[in-house]
């Protein structure tokens, strides 16, 4: 679902409406400006980071791809500022992914997704691979950023307590179909679909 929305996978049918535009069948060049405003945090912090790139280069990659900065100095300033926002430091910039814990790697992935200040971030099970002790830290980091910048999240998860904590609105999917959607409180107070009732 997440990879189809962001067009890593091609949709077989239907529409993907983003900012009033159907992006489901845009060509790669047409997707470029869309991608600047739509980023993704992947489920697996181990597989989603390039092992041959430093943390600095991983976070700088979107800035370079979208020609955001005019100089290497500006790139570094944005990278270091984002590292600080996700709870890391400039000293981490020269290291490689294998030198970090799972929670730190996911922070690097989050920094990469947020460095462009996108309108929408797709969070594909972003905490499921992390220790329980780290999960709340990562979720709070995302919430703090959202409150400061107004970013929207599409948070895909199976942990219903976490879903309730992070969501204003909830959609329930069953066998690839959206079977119910409502605001968070209504879903929990008055679930309508049998699958939703079973989850709760």
Residues covered by each model-derived region:
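Q-loop/switch helix immediately C-terminal to the Walker
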Residues: 53-64
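Conserved ABC transporter NBD signature motif
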Residues: 14-22, 34
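P-loop NTP-binding/switch modules centered on Walker-like glycine-rich loops
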Residues: 126, 130, 134-200
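Conserved ABC ATPase "signature" region
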Residues: 22, 73-91, 200
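Conserved ABC ATPase signature
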Residues: 96-100, 104
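Helix-to-loop junction immediately C-terminal to a conserved catalytic motif
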Residues: 6
């Amino acid at each position: 679902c997440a990879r189809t929305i962001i067009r890593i996978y091609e949709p077989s049918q239907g529409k993907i409406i983003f900012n009033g535009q159907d992006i489901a069948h845009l060509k790669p060049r047409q997707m470029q400006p869309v991608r600047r405003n739509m980023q993704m945090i992947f489920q697996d912090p181990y597989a989603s980071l390039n092992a041959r790139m430093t943390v600095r280069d991983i976070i700088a990659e979107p800035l370079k791809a979208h020609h955001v900065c005019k100089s290497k100095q500006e790139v570094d300033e944005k990278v270091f500022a984002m590292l600080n926002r996700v709870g890391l430091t400039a000293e981490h910039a020269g290291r490689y992914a294998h030198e970090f814990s799972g929670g730190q790697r996911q922070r690097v992935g989050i920094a990469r997704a947020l460095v462009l200040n996108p309108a929408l971030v797709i969070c594909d099970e972003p905490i499921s691979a992390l220790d329980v002790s780290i999960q709340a830290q990562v979720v709070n980091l995302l919430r703090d950023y959202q409150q400061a910048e107004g970013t929207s999240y599409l948070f895909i998860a199976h942990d219903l307590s976490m879903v309730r904590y992070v969501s204003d609105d909830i959609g329930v999917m069953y066998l690839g179909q959206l079977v119910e959607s409502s605001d968070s409180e209504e879903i929990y107070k008055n679930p309508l679909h049998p699958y939703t009732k079973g989850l709760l």
